[in-house]
Amino acid sequence: MAKNNAVAGFNALNGVELNLFTTDELKAIHYATMEVLMDPGIQVSDPEARQIFKENGCEVDEKTNVVKIPEYLVRKALQLAPSRFILWGRDKKFNTVQECGGKVHWTCFGTGVKMCKYQDGKYVTVDSVEKDIADIAKLCDWAENIDYFSLPVSARDIAGQGAQDVHETLTPIANTAKHFHHIDPVGENVEYYRDIVKAYYGGDEEEARKKPIFSMLLCPTSPLELSVNACQVIIKGARYGIPVNVLSMAMSGGSSPVYLAGTLVTHNAEVLSGIVLAQLTVPGAKVWYGSSTTTFDLKKGTAPVGSPELGLISAAVAKLAQFYGLPSYVAGSOSDAKVPDDQAGHEKTMTTLLPALSGANTIYGAGMLELGMTFSMEQLVIDNDIFSMVKKAMKGIPVSEETLAVESIQKVGIGNNFLALKQTRQLVDYPSNPMLLDRHMFGDWAAAGSKDLATVAHEKVEDVLKNHQVTPIDADILKDMQAIVDKADKAFRGM
């Protein structure tokens, strides 16, 4: 069995912890959700999924496609769903464990449609293309605080020309040795994804099932709908042993109640309906409890992700997932800023810290700007620094005989300093030590070129893209994997 990577993830609940709810409040959300799952129920558009629900005791209305899910099935599904599973990387040092109550991990945002590029001290936005996915994957492979890779942007140059989602599967796998999480899968193409992973394992389907280097995300449609695509991703993921992330994107005041507690009820109903479907399909199927839920800005007509409400909702979802014994995957490190600026730094720190202190198992949002529309590689490396600072805050202040340091205080005495102590020298890395954030005095900073953070981040991006080496895939195996993409392209073009 793979061991938890000591670098990947960070213990949340041993230092500073944020508890938003009492046990009674969590139960109240749960019982309200059980009412909603029976009245009005969930509209399930996929006939196969409706049949699975029906065969397992759900009331199904074939005229309206509404499924009513009784509480006993929810409880059964929660008992069957694993509280722990491994996300395998191509390089085993990048294996990460998703475990309820376990470590906190970070991954990049997905899926944007534009890139914010830093050119000659200015920012420009352009449509994202397949090469951007490859470059971001390489950058994430380097970033020590990005634990696995989620699809960050769309390959818009492939759209309408080939099997875009299949390209968006191989390109990340080939350009990072970390686990790949596909955020925009197509249900009818899941077999291609499975075959790509199987080809990586030399055609060994059982090995591909045991050690999934690939996982998928799907979103219910708020309020209270499971689309055909969402159902097929769940069903096929369960059957092929692919971990599946059921992630609600409710908007409070728009597609869910304006009250955040009410939004959590519809959110919970949507996610639990998907988890029940997975467990009815294959008992023990690996699932996340996911969230990209936020508020709807009634004045501006947007869904802000750099808001305190998003941070609170993500923190709340982490606690709901723990209540159910499930690993969680929540939005965080989010910003509505258009470029890597002061607003981005403020919003990303706030929306990262809240779910981290609640023990979310994965927080996704690194590199994201403009309400989730745009991705910036410079922002990604800045976020990598922010995560290191958040990890330090999560530790709190440990109190022990060693850290109370009475002997050191007595040894140094009155009016002296602790710089010369062997203990101080040995713990030179004990304080936070960001890579990019500047802590020099003004004169030293000016002498070094007076570079702002975005410039420093851009230089780091260029350095990584030029010099970082990703663990390669064997050429013959990569050829077999590419052949599956080519096959998907031919099918797309009707050839």
UniProtKB/Swiss-Prot annotation:
The pathway is: One-carbon metabolism; methanogenesis from trimethylamine
Report which reactions are catalysed by this protein.
Co(I)-[trimethylamine-specific corrinoid protein] + trimethylamine + H(+) = methyl-Co(III)-[trimethylamine-specific corrinoid protein] + dimethylamine
EC assignment: the record states 2.1.1.250
Under the heading InterPro entries, the entry gives: MttB-like_sf (IPR038601), MttB_Methanosar (IPR012740), MTTB_MeTrfase (IPR010426)
Looking at its record, which EC class is this enzyme? Answer: transferase
Query: A GO biological process this protein is involved in?
Result: methylation
Per UniProt, which keywords does this protein have?
A: Methanogenesis, Methyltransferase, Pyrrolysine, Transferase
Record Pfam families: MTTB (PF06253)
Superkingdom assignment: Archaea
Which GO molecular function annotations are given, in alphabetical order? trimethylamine methyltransferase activity
Give me the disulphide-bonded residues. Answer: none
Q: Give the family per the record.
A: Belongs to the trimethylamine methyltransferase family.
| Role summary | Catalyzes the transfer of a methyl group from trimethylamine to the corrinoid cofactor of MttC.
Protein's recorded name: Trimethylamine methyltransferase MttB
